[in-house]
Amino acid sequence: MAPTLATAHRRRWWMACTAVVENLLFSAVLLGWGSLLIMLKSEGFYSYLCTEPENVTNVTVGATAEPEHEEVSRMNGWLSCKAQDEMLNLAFTVGSFLLSAITLPLGIVMDKYGPRKLRLLGSACFAVSCLLIAYGASNPNSLSVLIFIALALNGFGGMCMTFTSLTLPNMFGDLRSTFIALMIGSYASSAVTFPGVKVIYDFGASFIVILVVWAGCSGLVFLNCFFNWPLEPFPGPEDMDYTVKIKFSWLGFDHKITGKQFYKQVTTVGRRLSVGSSMRSAKEQAALQEGHKLCLSTVDLEVKCQPDATAAPSFMHSVFSPILLLSLVTMCVTQLRLIFYMGAMNNILQFLVSGDQAVVSLYTSIFGVLQLLCLLTAPVIGYIMDWRLKECEDASEEPEEKDANPGEKKKKRDRQIQKITNATRAFAFTNLLLVGFGVTCLIPNLPLQILSFILHTIVRGFIHSAVGGLYAAVYPSTQFGSLTGLQSLISALFALLQQPLFLAMMGPLQGDPLWVNVGLLVVSMLGFCLPLYLICYRRQLERQLERKREDDKLFLKLNGSSNQEAFV
């Protein structure tokens, strides 16, 4: 039986810790494609596309066919060639596309029904994907096509795990961006899982046995979700900010009543006790003229709450807002840059070392180990997003408390402006690192690629954490899943360009990634548009805040108080 929200809140630390481990081992493991590619080629997936070059063993140096046949090699007794690389890279493209594109329907479903069912489905799909890869490895000459279905299920299941874990930070208040970054860090660090599996594989463990055990471990994720995750969506922090701090355990429930729920109750009671049948402003004026000192209806409450209702933008308004559109540009460019490098990394390394497979395997393992940096670096960007938020004025603060300490109120920062300032710094820093990564990719030096690995890992953890923190700061929590899913879908569609870029590198450019990297470096400059706009947006908010303060001063002079409350 599913636990209640109150029970889940008491278990939030257990759920957060297990979610980090589960994301690390079962979410976006497909990002460790470099190591998986070596194991798939060693197991013979699509090896039948390669032709044995026995009839041209003694071809002279001047023969035109020799370069084509030199690309055929053997891995663990199976043939390996360019045609095999292109087919497996296509499978990776499909899987990585679903890893991001599926988030839009997932977000819509999760916003409506909560994360529990999606997480159960995701863990089941991950287990099935492992079993399909194991089954395909039993007879690769006939079952290699299963890798497409397996990677698609792997991407879908992994994103279900990742996306549902992003709702957990709602239970941690002002630390939400930090916990979002931690979840995304574990998601990004899951690229270390396949390199870890490859180490076990290199020690002689059976590839099929490894995958079967992995599928069984996914069942533990299913059980953990079944016993600990509630059916209801986790309430957003904006609801918790307006919590009425009274526990109604004597009424049979121990959770707090949110501001929205409290307003609904007040509205219902007020309408029942209202002396009139009309709730319009005319009735309000009549009540005032009759000299009523106590207004039991909620006319004034509704009038005063109208600005708050209009302040919450509609979904379409959020979709076409400049912040979302510019974040889409930033994510599309960054996602294409990162996905292309992951998909083509083995071939880029082979170009640098002239085909030495041992060196390629070593550097692939180094890349995999460095993915653990995401667990350390992703919370950094979350900390930047949460910087000084505790020093900001609380919108849910009682008016009496604000009047009691006017001097202290002046010293506090505006929360919305501080969030925008933090997001500006986060995106500017992330894009600087992305440009630095593009520069290191242009230099054909093998040891320097370790720096490229580090920058790639940091940027991958930073960009998702920054976007998640920005959406959590700017948009309502009820739209967080849908907007994040829309962003992931569009960036995944744009990242499909990595397949033609890969074909161009392997074909006309003969394996040289220079010109592809130059083009991607130029395009990555578009990422600076978002922080520049956020600077302008922050100045606009500062001007609005100044006008509001001037209005408050005027209201104070006229009424003797700055509190603009409903008449009761």
Swiss-Prot record:
Claim: Transmembrane is one of the keywords in the record: yes
Residues annotated with Phosphoserine modification: 274, 278, 297
Main location: membrane
Residues carrying sugar: 55, 58, 559
Residue ranges, annotated region (Disordered): 395-415
Biological process per Gene Ontology, one example term: L-leucine transport
Keyword S-adenosyl-L-methionine included in the entry's annotation: no
One example GO MF annotation: neutral L-amino acid transmembrane transporter activity
InterPro entries according to UniProt: MFS, MFS_trans_sf
Key words of the record: Amino-acid transport, Cell membrane, Glycoprotein, Membrane, Phosphoprotein, Transmembrane, Transmembrane helix, Transport
Gene3D superfamilies named among the record's database cross-references: MFS general substrate transporter like domains
Protein activity control: Affinity and transport activity are regulated by a phosphorylation switch state at Ser-274 and Ser-297; increasing of affinity and amino acid transport activity via dephosphorylation at Ser-274 and phosphorylation at Ser-297.
CDD domains per UniProt: MFS
Membrane topology category: Multi-pass membrane protein
Protein name according to UniProt: Large neutral amino acids transporter small subunit 4
A Pfam family it matches: MFS_1
Role description: Uniporter that mediates the transport of the stereospecific L-phenylalanine, L-methionine and L-branched-chain amino acids, between the extracellular space and the cytoplasm and may control the transepithelial (re)absorption of neutral amino acid in kidney and small intestine. The transport activity is mediated through facilitated diffusion and is sodium ions-, chloride ions- and pH-independent.
Catalytic activity: L-leucine(in) = L-leucine(out); L-isoleucine(in) = L-isoleucine(out); L-methionine(in) = L-methionine(out); L-phenylalanine(in) = L-phenylalanine(out)
Mod. after translation: Glycosylated.
Lineage: Eukaryota, Metazoa, Chordata, Craniata, Vertebrata
Subcellular localization(s) per the UniProt record: Cell membrane; Basolateral cell membrane
Transmembrane segments: 20-40, 90-110, 120-140, 143-163, 180-200, 203-223, 313-333, 365-385, 434-454, 461-481, 489-509, 515-535
Gene Ontology CC terms, in alphabetical order: basolateral plasma membrane
Family: Belongs to the SLC43A transporter (TC 2.A.1.44) family.
